[in-house]
């Protein structure tokens, strides 16, 4: 049975803060940070934006592109590590907003930055089993980093929604297969009630990101019998610009393959939206027949790899909603004081 992406939608807040502005406040070397992270600015949510509003915007764009009846959607799953409520599903808010309720199921997912791709896999399973016609999988975050922490230079806001289905005439991209690699690795964590996450800093790269991304990617390549050169594009989770570039090189992918989907330098790490944002940016310019290799990563830790082939329908739906490049254009730059207010780092007494 053929399973794939019927439609997709992305959303990125317009507000941005430059690395130089954050470095100015904390007395850090902005040039060294930009060179090391390969990130130059990041997206900042407005005061009234959170993971739920971002998920709704992305889902609405996906529905605009698809042209399908929302009542056909049998499941909405939202992955995030910044759900606005500890007890109250983000996914029910999204479901109601897009007109999918009430004859459907909804749930929230958590797995650090790969909660969105875990939701994609869950929708794939439900669609392929025949339990539902269409499933909406979303990755959205308004990620946090403690003041002065290294994460503050990259923790950003954004989200992507993917409508998953099986009717071949509706598919904009076919998901050929998926593969996951998971271990118990405490590289990044936040307990209930803690405002900011903790992490192992520079010691998390090899045992966390690189171990799981490379093993997940190799697992899918071996499963399919494919090689990096069989793909036109590649997308890897983007906590910064350096990590996906290094992972691609290690696996045998080229800079040209990852360039179209490498959006982190301009918007930062959108966490659960990160890999999906790269896929969306790639779909925005891919041609029918092009193949995309993608691997998401989530701390804790695990990876989800996907092999995707673009269909003719991409040309029909692509321009029905804003592309990622259009969403990134015309940013509104803010200073650290306004950024701190938007992010809730300072509050009225």
UniProtKB/Swiss-Prot annotation:
GO terms for biological process: farnesyl diphosphate biosynthetic process, mevalonate pathway; isopentenyl diphosphate biosynthetic process, mevalonate pathway. Keywords: Acyltransferase, Isoprene biosynthesis, Transferase. (3S)-3-hydroxy-3-methylglutaryl-CoA binds at residues 29-30, 113, 154, 204, 237, 246, 269, 299. GO terms for molecular function: acetyl-CoA C-acetyltransferase activity; hydroxymethylglutaryl-CoA synthase activity. It is an enzyme of class 2 (transferase). It comes from the Archaea. CoA binds at residues 202, 242. Belongs to the thiolase-like superfamily. Archaeal HMG-CoA synthase family. Catalyzes the condensation of acetyl-CoA with acetoacetyl-CoA to form 3-hydroxy-3-methylglutaryl-CoA (HMG-CoA). Functions in the mevalonate (MVA) pathway leading to isopentenyl diphosphate (IPP), a key precursor for the biosynthesis of isoprenoid compounds that are building blocks of archaeal membrane lipids. Interacts with acetoacetyl-CoA thiolase that catalyzes the precedent step in the pathway and with a DUF35 protein. The acetoacetyl-CoA thiolase/HMG-CoA synthase complex channels the intermediate via a fused CoA-binding site, which allows for efficient coupling of the endergonic thiolase reaction with the exergonic HMGCS reaction. NCBIfam families: HMG_CoA_syn_Arc, PRK04262.1. This is Hydroxymethylglutaryl-CoA synthase. It comes from Methanosarcina barkeri (strain Fusaro / DSM 804).
């Amino acid at each position: 049975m053929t399973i794939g992406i019927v439609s997709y939608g992305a959303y990125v807040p317009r507000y941005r803060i430059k690395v130089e502005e954050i470095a100015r406040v904390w007395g850090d070397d902005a040039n060294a940070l930009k060179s090391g992270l390969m990130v130059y600015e990041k997206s900042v949510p407005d005061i009234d934006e959170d993971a739920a509003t971002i998920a709704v915007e992305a889902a609405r764009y996906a529905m605009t592109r698809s042209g399908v009846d929302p009542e056909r959607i049998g499941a909405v799953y939202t992955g995030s590590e910044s759900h606005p409520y500890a007890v109250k599903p983000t996914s029910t808010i999204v479901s109601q907003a897009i007109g999918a309720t009430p004859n459907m199921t909804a749930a929230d997912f958590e797995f650090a930055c790969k909660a969105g791709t875990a939701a994609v896999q869950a929708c794939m399973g439900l669609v392929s089993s025949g339990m539902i016609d269409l499933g909406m999988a979303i990755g959205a975050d308004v990620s946090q980093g403690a003041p002065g922490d290294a994460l503050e230079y990259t923790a950003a806001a954004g989200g992507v929604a993917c409508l998953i289905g099986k009717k071949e005439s509706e598919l904009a991209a076919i998901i050929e297969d998926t593969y996951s690699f998971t271990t118990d690795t405490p590289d990044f964590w936040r307990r209930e009630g803690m405002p900011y996450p903790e992490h192992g800093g520079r010691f998390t790269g090899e045992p966390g990101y690189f171990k799981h991304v490379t093993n997940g990617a190799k697992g899918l390549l071996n499963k399919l019998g494919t090689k990096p050169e069989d793909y036109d594009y590649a997308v890897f989770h983007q906590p910064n610009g350096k990590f996906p570039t290094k992972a691609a090189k290690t696996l045998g992918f080229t800079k040209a393959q990852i360039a179209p989907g490498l959006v982190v330098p301009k918007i930062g790490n959108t966490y659960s939206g990160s890999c999906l944002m790269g896929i969306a940016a790639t779909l925005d310019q891919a041609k029918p027949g092009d193949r995309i290799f993608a691997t998401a990563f989530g701390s804790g830790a695990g990876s989800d790899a996907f092999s995707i082939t673009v269909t003719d329908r991409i040309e029909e739906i692509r321009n029905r909603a804003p592309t990622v490049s259009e969403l990134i254009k015309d940013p509104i730059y803010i200073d650290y004081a306004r950024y701190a207010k938007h992010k809730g780092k300072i509050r009225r007494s």
